[in-house]
Amino acid sequence: MQDRQKAQDYRALLLADTPLIDVRAPIEFEQGAMPGAINLPLMMDDERAAVGTCYKRQGADAALALGHRLVCGDIRQQRLEAWKAAYQRFPNGYLCCARGGQRSHIVQRWLQETGIDCPLIEGGYKALRQTAIQATWQLAQKPILLIGGCTGSGKTQLVRQQPNGVDLEGLARHRGSSFGRTLKPQLSQASFENKLAVELLKINARQTLKRWVLEDEGRTIGANHLPECLRERMAQAPIAVVEDPFALRLERLREEYFIRMHHDFTHAYGDGAGWQAYSEYLHHGLFAIRRRLGLQRFAELTDTLDRALAEQLSSGSTDGHMAWLVPLLNEYYDPMYRYQLEKKAANIVFRGTWQDVANWLKAQ
């Protein structure tokens, strides 16, 4: 066990999905964490704030003494039991704090007193975070091919089928448009970047990689923005454009946004609350682009959406949604994407149907 007491091979830890018992305060964890980490704090937010204030006013010794007073007795025992349970569940796990300092060492010592020898991450979360940033920069230097196409072209599915494909929208938990949110909340920016770095490392490790295949994304995916090093490379990358018939795109969008999202909401919240959440989701997506549509057009499409929802609720049919989706594509989404694509016309290396692009990718 001695060789595991301090870990410095950060890439190996990230590649192995090493469980991390992260003892930072909840606010620190929410701001940024590694995939596979569970938050079992030594100090809660208010306790950490009090210790920090004490440190500034009275110094390190007084702050340490305050920390021990705050985390003692039943509180200390409850947290110790949680760490013990986590280590028993993840015996290959590591303790992690902000910089591999006192917090992880204190928890390690308390566990040792119970007979558990849990190693820690030397350098803590900060060292892992720096490793993730460096890995993304390094791996972003490899060639990139983008998959482009209007909304409903099946780009994400195509990317997912590639052994060297990176599903940026899946990592961001958002599909990129005003209707793009999923039932899972988006991660913080740092957590998204960390997850992306680990995904790049894993794909790179399991094959001889000639290039990445990514979806042609904007600078942001929902609330997350792409790392600048990756975005700069994507701006110059060649693009294969999917050009499927409009009717086929409509059917994909019907399945994804009206059938699947309705199912997901009702499965998560039950019929009544799920329907309400689904309805609010569609209304919110339309509301988010009201200024670009113009307020009169927004009001017209909202009325059409309301009628479509009433029809879906009464009969289960999603046909009514086509009456607002078709003009939304024709008047907003398609012109916007085509304008963006025109600016990158020199980068287009292939055009074809979804199947044409899939076959072309196999032949590369």
Curated annotation (Swiss-Prot):
SMART domains: RHOD
This protein's UniProt keywords: Selenium, Transferase
Annotated ranges, domain Rhodanese: 14-137
Catalysed reactions, as listed in the record: 5-methylaminomethyl-2-thiouridine(34) in tRNA + selenophosphate + (2E)-geranyl diphosphate + H2O + H(+) = 5-methylaminomethyl-2-selenouridine(34) in tRNA + (2E)-thiogeraniol + phosphate + diphosphate; 5-methylaminomethyl-2-thiouridine(34) in tRNA + (2E)-geranyl diphosphate = 5-methylaminomethyl-S-(2E)-geranyl-thiouridine(34) in tRNA + diphosphate; 5-methylaminomethyl-S-(2E)-geranyl-thiouridine(34) in tRNA + selenophosphate + H(+) = 5-methylaminomethyl-2-(Se-phospho)selenouridine(34) in tRNA + (2E)-thiogeraniol; 5-methylaminomethyl-2-(Se-phospho)selenouridine(34) in tRNA + H2O = 5-methylaminomethyl-2-selenouridine(34) in tRNA + phosphate
Enzyme active site: 97 (s-selanylcysteine intermediate)
KW NAD (keyword) present: no
GO BP terms, alphabetized: tRNA wobble uridine modification
InterPro entries cross-referenced by the UniProt entry: Rhodanese-like_dom (IPR001763), Rhodanese-like_dom_sf (IPR036873), SelU (IPR017582)
E.C. number(s) listed in UniProt: 2.9.1.3
EC category name: transferase
Family matches, as PROSITE patterns: RHODANESE_3
Gene Ontology molecular functions: transferase activity, transferring alkyl or aryl (other than methyl) groups; tRNA 2-selenouridine synthase activity
Keyword Iron: no
The organism's place on the tree of life at top rank: Bacteria
Main function: Involved in the post-transcriptional modification of the uridine at the wobble position (U34) of tRNA(Lys), tRNA(Glu) and tRNA(Gln). Catalyzes the conversion of 2-thiouridine (S2U-RNA) to 2-selenouridine (Se2U-RNA). Acts in a two-step process involving geranylation of 2-thiouridine (S2U) to S-geranyl-2-thiouridine (geS2U) and subsequent selenation of the latter derivative to 2-selenouridine (Se2U) in the tRNA chain.
Subunit record text: Monomer.
Family of the protein in this entry: Belongs to the SelU family.
UniProt protein name: tRNA 2-selenouridine synthase
